[in-house]
Structure formats: structure tokens, C-alpha cells
């Protein structure tokens, strides 16, 4: 209750046109009731309710009315209306109990005028109490009144002297209880009577239109039947109608209320079908006394009655939408406020008029207890009758129309905008619209371009575009150029060029410098040496050579004797060869002579003279035309003249020990003569003659050269700075350059690393350089912003070259913040209303950041090891306590995922979400710290619920994860460390159903299939190429399960990735000392030509797994294999001699240990070449095979016949010496725990080729798929026929059902571009889980994982071709969601539902899915 008036009175609200800050209420003392004062006085009062914040019982006890006038009689009805310029506050009309109609001027009443002055009309036309009174809402000057005996008068207040009658008095009316004007048609009036009728009048026609009556179960329109009110039918159905009200919007609808306590109903009538009420509302316990229909909202109807209740209804639905607190006595009147529909008032006989608000905020108080402890002196009757007031307000179940939004909208996850709206006539049946909402189209465009670049592997071009984009910040241009260089093979050279360094430029500058030296004569020339004039005495030449020790002493003595001035201490300058004067090579002229001047030759040429050309080489080596002059030097002491033509003895001949030679030179010469290079080098070094030292050290060996270099660097590094750098380069100690070189020359340091560092050292060295630059950045960021940014840019370049994502991410985050601030600043300067663009600035900066991160990951192939090492501790995973080195990057990825999702890019968002650990919890507010798993689940749900659309935004995100995982390596394989649990075989029987097989394909098969159960294999680089898809009937993973539960899928070929043939086993046994099953890969040589000539095989019947299995007593005992012995136990017996060495591979492809392969193409095996029976009963699985194995089938003349064994069959006995080749389609060995196959499971079919008697040979291989690798398996051992001649009539197996599925595929295997966008989560989740299995599975189970991968690829092939039904796709989506959530049980339940209704390739693929689920 908002307010109340202490009066037992009828009331009326001031009209809507009344101008006041708050509405007024007029009250008139009600007739037939007494108040607390027991006064007989009748008052007309005007009130302004005090709207208190609380409804305490005494808050309005002393409230006084604004005006009060005494009247001659009490009031039955009070109405307030007809406000006009002459009477702005309107007129107050009252129906009194004495039959008088009184009308007062409200303005005069408020002015406290005398009663005679305030009353406008006082009419006594009515003969009885006036209980009906209403102003016409469309013509306010008309006032209707009703009294006893069906009296109805219409008053024109402009001339109220004489009233008008609506027509002839109706016989169906007695006392008029209520009347109401139609809200849409001004001349229609409805009147209700105590007789039980409600009559509708047409005042224009002055006639009764219709009379409505409620007869107990339905209303009755009796006006047209001429039934009188006093008739039996009418008398039996009389129930007084206490109130009537018109629909505020529809002129043909109205409601009536019954005051009968036995049938307190409200009837909704439609005059177009007036024979029965349209609806009946029940809820009151006793008769209803008043109705009020809200003019502003037709869905709100008030009623009150004898049960002390005031109820708010929705007449459209007949529901109670609210109820006021009950009064302690009858509530006899209720009205909506005309001006403020949120206010309403009720009057009751408990002496209060309550004013209520629909927006009351008062908290409800607890109800008083039913019984209270009474004091001894208390008055029982006073307490029993005390009014109980509560503060409980009216609370509606539905919003009123003026508060109801005509259109509502809300943003949904995934860029969805949900809006609802509808016509005002049907507010509760609105139309719901679901729209894609893109608030940042530039982000969508850029994200789409990024995805296109990833899909098209054109990220280098993407970098070039970003670096040339005018919108790119200058700081980012260097980043994009550096990123572009990382995609090139010679990225180091590109980085060097990016910094402005060029070898060509250096070479050009050196050439220019040399030319300048020549022109200016500034090149230093070695001092001329005085020529030898006196020969050395002969005794000097004949001196005995000292020993090594003596020579060392002599060297030391020379070091002491030689004066420093006599030894060149300055380094010899580098000069051109043309500038060096060597007089000993140009005749006997002394050095420095006039004709020996270095420029004399050129001077003679310029003077036109032609001097005699003399060569630096001896003339006897130039020409034989000169006269033979024998060299005296060559012939002295010779028994015969020398045969070598020589010039005569010239002064150019030299002495080994010239006289003017220093003692140090003599010692060097002596050491050289003896080959003592180390001593000579030592003397040269001590004499600072490093050029001579290096020449001698080169002849002395690498060790001496290294010592010479070290000594040279020690002495000369301080004088020549470039030697410090060269020393680091020569000694492979670039760490010294990185750590000690001045950072002002960081570019030179970086170029040195790019030029000289080793591949395995480059990353660490550039990281160290980046760390030095980053440290300078951290120091300068608070003082010199410009210098700090320069250091950061340089550090980013170093980290990019080093491939350190964790380093560069932090610095790019700083750049992102700066870019965001810059965008905000630009926005503020451009437009003051920038509040809505803060999100855009953040989005733009974040998009740039993620573009750089994505491109960088793809360029360097970054591997995030945290993704490969999931958290093992469940508590740590739940709390998010694990620390990650890329945590800041993960936070930005989560933010970017939400940004993409907000723009409707669900698939790209899901791909980026997968680049964070599953248990990572972003840092931020609690409501935004959902783990990566929760975010993925939400994205998956949005992806599943999203309709299939081929929009540009969605099509551009087809292969985000595929590209990102291949390049960014978020899911790249990491070294495995965990064990591998035995495979749960649940769900393997799903592939037992086999469809009909088509005819033989015309395209030749290619045998590249790998045996998933073969022994350990070499690296994939040695093996045959992996096929992109797998056989849907590839061998199931073995497990220790009962025989009846084992599937019998038929193997077939998968598509070959390449067209090459496999001529030998793709995998060789890892341990030849152990009898191992030969791997798949038997020769396909000799098949490609004749396969096309074979007739179509007969159709294959469906096999029902387990219906005719071998009894468990005959089967070999099964054991659960261990991780170490699993590959051993799966090997079949391939030789009767266990200790025999493995055979070499057959030239036709037979695996080691396999029987001789079949003849080459064109050769026909002899009919007599049948396998002999085994020498002894084999043990183990072979025994069961021999007992129940199928009869052998002899191969046809043109190579292997059609057929395919089941993967669950064990290998039979030892091979024959002339058995046909196992071929690429022989069945694989049975795994540990696999059931013994029953030979009778294969149904007999007519049309088999004839066979000879005796033991049967291997089952012939089946037809290969076009371009598919064959199922190269180990050769089978011949089986003993169960009956003589049992091989006769055995049918050849037709081509596998996989051939039919493959031939019908619209797109080639491995293609994933046609997978619908809403099904992309299936592809990426399965590929990601397969990558996880490959990374974590031990090597012993590699073939099992490969088999799972082939099954998944086959399933994805069908998904790409659109051959999987919608129900299965939906189930796969649910499985993917469960896998992402790591909900193993839910995934198993969904998988069970799928496998029970799937067959063919889908069933085979689901086996791979089951493998993934089992490893969660």
C-alpha cells in the first residue's frame, strides 16, 4: 500500500486532463455502512494522498482532506469528469441513496465555497437510489445515470435541465447496478442489472441491441428471443450482475461480473457471438462488487468482492497476474488512476481507501501469527476485530504495457542478436528474430584475410601487404618486414639486407678506396732493400748446422743481439702487387737504379718508346727460340752440361745468407733450411714479422697456424680493433661479441651472428643479444620513451630471428597497449562521442597482435610444449595453479577468441581456443576466468547450433587449425613419456556389416598400405609414403575379449598418396632374431595390368560377427599383452624352423620369412604347385586354424584371384615351398588375444575357380582400389583341409566393400576443403586427438596409432564428400564436445548409440573414434 485514506466511502480519481503534480481523489460517504465514528453525516471530500515510503498503520491517521462539503444523502456512486476551460478541474457527479443526482464544481469545492455555490446540478428525476454513473470518455459532456426499475438517463451537462432516455425501458432490467460507455463508439452504452442481465444500448438508434445473461454454465443472449425477465428460464438463471466494463481497445468486447456468492465469476463477452461468454474467469470466493479495466493496458483488469480480495487479471489468458493485500471487510470498489496507470485504489468496508502502486518497493512484512497470546486484561473482541494491515504491495507476473518493451533485443554468444517484437494487439505472441550482428566489420575483414593467408600458405604475401598498408603503424612496419624474411630459405641473408648491409656495397666501396690509394699515392710501400753486392764467404755456407737445441739457443741469442732498430716493428702495409719492387726478378740491375724505377716502364710508354719487355719469370721458361745458354749455377759441380736453357749468370742470382742479412734473418733461414718452422715462426713473432710468421705457419701445420693466430691476436688486437672481432670469428667464440660488444653497434653484432654463427647456435646467440636490448628497453622506458621504443624494436627483431615466441609476445603486448592508447587518442581528437569506440580500439590492437603471433608461429614452426604436456594433477588442473611461460599470450588468445565469437567467427575462435592448455584459467575478473575447456565447450555448442551457411566469414575459416597446427605447431608431436594402456575393444563390432561390392575398378591399384601390426619400422622417410586415408576394414586393434565380441571387418585398400609401386615390405622387422610377422608390403608387381582384365567378382554377403565362432575350448589361450611384448605376441609363425635367420626380401616384394612369391607377370603357376601339409601340428593359434580353417583356394592363372581374409584369422601352418605370393592383400597377423577365426564363417558361393585336391593354398588377395596402397600383409601358412577335396567349390572373395565406397567419393582422399563449416569441429578435434596419440604413444604401439589415423582419415573423407547422414554428424558433434570436455563416459554413451546404427566406412571410422575415446 502506497497510501490510504481513513474513510468508509466511495471514491473517484481526478480526470486525466486534470493538471496537477499528483492526482486527487474525491470521496463520498458510502451508503449502507457505518464508520468508526458512527456518524450519520455525509461528506464530499477531496484528498491529496500522502505517498509515504512505508505503510505504517498510523501514518495517515491525522491526514486532512483538501476540501469537504456536506451533502443531503450518502453516496452510492461517485464520478469525476468533464474538465473544460470553464471548469478546468472538472465536475463531480454523485448518485445518492435518496435518488438524487448531484453535480459539483470541483474547483469551487477546492476553493471552500459554500455548498450552494459549489453544487451545479441537483436533480431528483430518478425514483430510487442511483447506483450507475459514468462520464462518456469520447464526449465528456455526456453523463449517464442508472437507478431502480431500469431507469437510465443520459445527461448533457451543457444543458442539464432535461435528461435523455436511451430508448424504451427494457423489461430485462431491474435495478441498475453499473453502467459504462463504450471506449471506441460514443453512442454505445452498457448497463448491468440485479436481474442478471447486461443490456447494450445503441443511443443513436435509441434501441436495445443485445441482452447478455449468464445462466450458470454459459451466458445467454435472450434479447432476440423475446423472453421476459419474469419467465421461468430467466427466473432460473437470474444472478445479479454487479459491474460492467468495456474493452479499452476493442469495441465489441466487454466484461461483466456476478455478485452471486455461489457463482462469483467474471465473464468476457464478444458481441459478435453474444450467445455465450467468450471466457469465464474464476478466482473469487464470493460475489464480485466492482470491475475496472485499465485504459492503458487491456491485459490488466481489476476486480474486488465480498471475499475481501482485490485481484488483477489478464483477461486474454484468464490468469491472475497479481493480488492486493486482503482487507478485513468487503472490498466494494476498485479503480485505476486515469492519469497514472501505475496507481490504483480500492475501497473496503474496513474504513480505508487504499492507494497502491505497481512499482512499490516496500519489502513485504511477515504475516501475523494466526493466534496470539492474550493478556488477562485484554479485550478479546477488540483484538479479534482489529484491522490487520500489511505493507505487501501489488506484484504483477507480467509487466504492464507502459513498462513493457515493444521491442526487446539481447546479444547472444557467437555474434547473435536476438530481437522480439509484435503488434500491440498481441503483445505476448511476438516474433523472434535471430540475426548475425557484426559490430567490428574491419576486424572480420582482417581476420578473414588472415585465415585466407593461412589456408593458401601465403603468409609471406600477407606480411608484405601489412607492411605496405597505410594504416600500419611505423613501429609495426619493421615487424612485418622481419616476419616476411622468416618465410624464405635464406632468411639470414634477408635479415642482413633488411638492416641495410650488402656485400656488393662493401665490395664497391673497397674498390673505390683502392682506386683512391692508387691515384693519390697514399698507399704505403715497403722500404726498398739494398741489393747484394758482395757474395757471402764460402765458409758461411759450409758451416755445420746446429742441432735443434742449438738452433733454439741461437734464436734466443739472436733475439738478444738484434737491435730493435734493425727489426721492423711496424706492420707491413698492404700494397698492390704492381707497387712492389723486386729487383732480383728483372735482371742484374740493382734495386733503385735508374732503369729499374717502377715508373720507368710507364714513362717510356707515355714517351712513345718501346722498351724491351722483360718478364718476372726466367726467360728459359718463356720461349725456346732464344739461344741456349746454360746456367752456370745449374751446372757447377755437374758432370755434364745442364739441359736446362738458362740465361748467363746475372746479378739477380741470390745467396741464401747475404752478407748484410741480420742475425735474426740468418737464424730464420737456418730454421727454414732444416724445416724447423716452429722456431722460425717464434722468431718472426718476436720480431713482429707476422706476415712471415703466418707464411711459415701455413707450411708448419694447423696446430702451428693456430698458435700463430693466437699469438698474433694477443699482440695486435689492442692496436687493430677489427682483430678482436676476427678473433671471435676464427675461434668460434661469438658469445664474446654478443656479450661484450657495444650495444650501439647491435646491428653489426646481429649481422656477424647471421654471417658466422652455426645453425644450432644462432637462436641462443640472437636471444642473448635480444635480452641485452630488452634490458636497455626496461631501463629507458621510464626516462626516454623514444630510445626505449628503439631498443624494443631492435630486441623484437632479435627475438624474431631466434624464434622465441615467449620473449617476443611480451614486447608485442606492450606495443598492443600503446597502439590501443593511440587509437583512443585519435578517436577523442576526432569525435567527442568516443565512448562507443573504446571497444573498437581494443579490438584493432588485439587483431594486430594476433596477426603477428599467428604469422610468427607459422614462420618458425613454433612448438608449445605446454600443450603437449597436460597437467597430470587433477587438483592443480582444477585450481589452475600450474604456471605457464606463455600465460600472457594465453590471456590475449582467450580475449581474441571472445572477440571473434562476438563477431560471429565461431570456427576461427575455436581454432585459437585450442592453442591454449585445457586447464588454463585466464587472469581477470572471476566471471571471465573460465578455463579453456569451458570456453571450447561453449564454442562447440555454438558451432553445433549454428545453421549451415556459406558466408564469406565462415568459409574463410575452414582450415585455421589445420594450417596453424602444421605451421605454428600448437599440436605438434612431442617426445612421449607416458605409457600406453591396453586398447579397449569396445565398439569394434560396428564394422561387421558389409555392403555389396561393385565391379573391379579400371584404375590399377598401388600397394603402399602399412601393416598396423607389423614389427617396429624405420622412420617414415625410409618407408613408403603414408596414405591419406585408410581402409575402413583395416585390422581392428587386438584386445583380450571373448571371441563372440570380436568384429570381422573385411580389409580393403586405402587410397595411395602417390602413384609409386611398393616392391618390398615397407617395414622390416626390428629384431630379426625373433620370428616376427613380415610386414605388409608384398609385391604389387604384376598386378596392375591384369587387374583390369578380371571379371567382376560376386557380391559379398554380410557377415554377422560371432554367430559361428570357434568354441573357446579350441581357441588358443589369450593373454593381455604388455606394452613391451605386444609387438612380439602379434607375430605369426612364418617358418617351421624358429631359429632360422630371416630371409632377404624377395625381388617381387615378399617379406622376410615369407614363402616364395608368385611368378612375375605373364607367368602361370603350375597346377601341381600346391602347399604340402605341415610337418607337425603347430601349437598356439595355428592349431585352431587347422581344425576349422576353410579349404584352400588355388589362385587363377592370371595372378591372384579376388579375395580378402578377415583380420581376426590366425595364420595357418608352415608355408609351402611353392606357395603363391602373399601379395599386397594378404591378411595381417592376429594380434594378442584375437579370436581364432572360424573357417566356416565364409559362406559358400558359386562361381569359384576350380581347384585341385590336397591342402588349400592361401586365400587369394582381393582387388585393389584405384590408386590405393595394397594391404600388404604377411603370407599365410597353408591350412589343412577339413575334408578331402575341401578346396573345391570354395568361392573367391570379391572386391572389398571399400572399393565401392572409394569409387563413389566425389573428392579425392585427403581433401578437406568441402567439409561444411559447421562440421569443422569434428575434423579439427579428431585430427588434434590423433596428433596427441601419436605424440604420447610408445613406439611399440605406433602401428596401432597409424591404424587409428587411417580410420579417422577415412571418416573425414566421407565427411568431406557429404556421405554421412545428419544424425551421425550430430552424434559426432556431441562426441567431439565430450572429447573436448574430457568426459569419457558421455563420449562412450554417444559412441554406443552411433555404432549400433552405423555400417560400412562410417562404422570402420568409428572404431578409430573409439580408440581416441579410450585414451582420454
Curated annotation (Swiss-Prot):
Any GO CC annotation of this UniProt entry: endoplasmic reticulum membrane
Highest taxon, organism lineage: Eukaryota
GO molecular function: structural molecule activity
Record SMART domains: WD40
GO terms (BP aspect): COPII-coated vesicle cargo loading; endoplasmic reticulum organization; protein transport
WD repeat boundaries on the chain: 8-48, 70-114, 125-165, 171-211, 236-279, 283-323, 326-366, 410-435
Main location: membrane
Topological type in the membrane: Peripheral membrane protein
Record PROSITE patterns: WD_REPEATS_1, WD_REPEATS_2, WD_REPEATS_REGION
Residues annotated as signal peptide: none
Name used for this protein in its record: Protein transport protein SEC31
Species of the source: Mycosarcoma maydis
